Amino acid sequence: LDIPLPPIEYLQRWGRPIAYDYIPKPFPLSAYQTVFARSAGSAEMPSAGRPFTRSLLACLRRSGVQLARLVLHTGVASLEQHEEPYEEWYEVPLRTAELVRATHARGGRVIAVGTTVVRALESSVDAAGNVIASRGWTDLVITPERRIRVVDGLLTGLHEPKATHLAMLEAIAGRNVIARAYAEALDREYLWHEFGD
């Protein structure tokens, strides 16, 4: 590929974020950045992190919530039934792995912000069931049949009814909880994707 600029610079100049039908006009690229963003590499915004602000993170810390960082380069969400999600690049640093292990050791809960975080943490488990520092591409597909080993809860947006991420939600919360949540979302006409409810 021969382009006149470095790839990231070229994409920043000419690329456009994925936009869904309910978005009336294009948003600036900055609207797609979460407070967690540190380096370029995602194909889509990790949308579960979008509602978080620096103020909210400070409030969570003051209330005793510990935050752990990792690197995620989200892929494009799969909308086709039975189509597996694309591989995604992740890095779980040693400090994060240690914090996850310490949280579980004291009986605490690990709550992931987004499905990509779940895939990253679950891909970083050793044979003994402990989270370790790791990085690479994950092609992990989590379903109710594939037991969750690390994550105790998940903050996420609404996923298309046939998306593979819906199976992950069922693995974490159970089919009945997800069915009730989606019934309410449809009844109240919640929005989906990056700027949804």
How would you describe each model-predicted region?
Residues 1-197:
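Surface-exposed, charge/polar-rich loops and edge strands
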